A protein has these predicted regions:
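Conserved N-terminal glycine/acidic-rich loop preference
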Residues: 196
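Expand to "…catalyze enediolate/carbanion chemistry for C-C bond making/breaking, isomerization
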Residues: 190-191, 201-205
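C-terminal active-site rim and adjoining tail of enzyme catalytic domains
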Residues: 165, 199-201
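Conserved alpha/beta-domain cores
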Residues: 1-184, 190-192
Length: 205
């Protein structure tokens, strides 16, 4: 565990999601004892295996519609809402549980064909459509920036996200989360307005 980094992160005024994929329950407990208690999982099965209600959980990986029923009611935030079909299923399951599910809309800001997310240019229209769902609360937007040595490109992606976030925040009072930045680029993301970072190996190793 990187105790020094954990202490440094706790002192900051942004939220930290400790990405716990491939980590054991023991490692999660150890990080929690050091003061970080929000964890992010990529895969539903792994989340179910590790779920502990005393911690806060985010799903941050691509989410299949048929897996939604296993996580609604347990997960605090679904950070990877990227389609209307997925929104409909989250709405259905949240309604069944009698809860309002917090979500972030994942936007595809990178040109990388392997990245998932709703097309960035259509984000406003999509978020407007999502307002019809009574059991979904849109808390903000999320992205995974390009994995590249080109810092200017990454900064440009973060800046576009931040500009959109500020515009959405004015329009929708519930929106308060801009989730961007991981182990390799979180400092850059925070510089460009991120208030939630998702850090895995830098914390756990």
């Amino acid at each position: 565990m990187n105790k020094e980094l954990i202490e440094e992160l706790k002192a900051q005024d942004f939220n930290v999601v400790a990405v716990s994929k491939m980590r054991t329950k023991e490692e999660i407990d150890e990080v929690a004892k050091m003061g970080l208690t929000t964890f992010g999982e990529n895969r539903v099965q792994e989340f179910i295996d590790k779920y502990d209600p005393k911690y806060t959980w985010h799903i941050i990986g691509h989410l299949q519609t048929n897996k939604v029923k296993y996580i609604v009611g347990k997960v605090d935030v679904i950070e990877s809402l990227d389609s209307l079909k997925l929104a409909e299923e989250i709405e259905k399951q949240a309604n069944k549980h009698g809860i309002i599910q917090k979500v972030l809309v994942e936007l595809k800001i990178s040109e990388d064909p392997n990245k998932t997310g709703y097309p960035f240019k259509d984000a406003k229209n999509f978020i407007s459509q999502l307002q019809e769902f009574k059991h979904i609360q849109i808390k903000g937007i999320m992205c995974v920036a390009s994995k590249t040595e080109d810092q200017a490109l990454v900064e440009s992606e973060f800046e576009q996200m931040h500009t959109l976030y500020l515009e959405l925040k004015e329009q929708y009072p519930d929106i308060d989360t801009l989730s961007m930045g991981m182990s390799q680029d979180y400092k850059l993301a925070v510089k460009h307005g991120s208030n939630t970072v998702r850090i895995g190996h830098a914390i756990f190793e």
